[in-house]
Amino acid sequence: MPSADDIKQLAPTGKLRGGIAVAPAASAFFAIKSGGEVRGVTVDLLRSFAEQLKMPLALQVYDNSGQVTEAVAKGDCDITFMPQDAERAKKVDFGPAYYLIASTYLVPAGSAIQSIDEVNRAGVRIIAISSTTTSRSARRTAPNAAIEEVPSVEQLTDMARKGDGDAFALSHDSFVTLLPKLPGARVLPGNFQQTGIAVAVPKSRPAALKLAGQLLEAAKTSGLVGRALDAAGFTDAEVSP
């Protein structure tokens, strides 16, 4: 059992303030909001953590991982899960990962684009979620294309449905549940980014980081992460070692 001091550093308000990002369809990272309720892998993990710590869970809902990053960096949020990259590591401290994501592009119905390499061309308009690891990787790997950032997966999905853009950047697992909503759209094979979805806490809270890491590792070992992925519809997903 963690010490009272460790718990206080992780949750100084007496509540576990857990940050989650929502989208129109679930992924290994995004939760979905329906009828005033949020569901998803990250929600299941945070609920379990709060139960183990014997404290209430205060879920904080955001449109994208960039917003969650800023909330954690300011200390407004105690714990979250998000894709790792060097830019984020300047703002939050990362613990272990529970899932490895790979980002690619979706192209709308009728598109002539067949590969990720073909996206990196002048005149190609890429739509990505603002302040995310995927948007930063798209800028780095497709310097010849034009990158337009939008605030939410919901807006990206709506633009893809209308064909308002040439390539839409997200992780493969996000497209598993989004693709059925976009008739004629295709997901390009391969990836332009791979990273882990890891637990994160505010910087300079070493006891909080250690405790968060222990909770996640226990969730992986106990099968909780696997069950949460299964419940979200990702029965073939592999838990990160």
Language-model features: where?
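Ligand-binding cleft/hinge of the Venus flytrap
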Residues: 28-35, 46-56, 134-152, 179-180, ...
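Extracytoplasmic small-molecule ligand-binding "clamshell" domains
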Residues: 1-83, 222, 231
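Short helix-initiation/N-cap motifs at beta->coil->alpha
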Residues: 58-70, 113-114, 148-162, 195
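A ligand-binding cleft/hinge motif common to bilobed small-molecule-binding domains
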Residues: 66, 82-91, 137, 161-193
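Periplasmic-binding protein-like
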Residues: 99-110, 172, 176-217, 235-241
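Flexible hinge/capping segments at coil-to-helix
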Residues: 98, 107-125
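Extended ligand-binding regions for polar small-molecule ligands
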Residues: 1-7, 37-52, 117, 131-132, ...
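Short loop->beta-strand "edge-of-pocket" segments that line small-molecule binding or catalytic clefts
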Residues: 14-22, 38-39, 117-134, 146
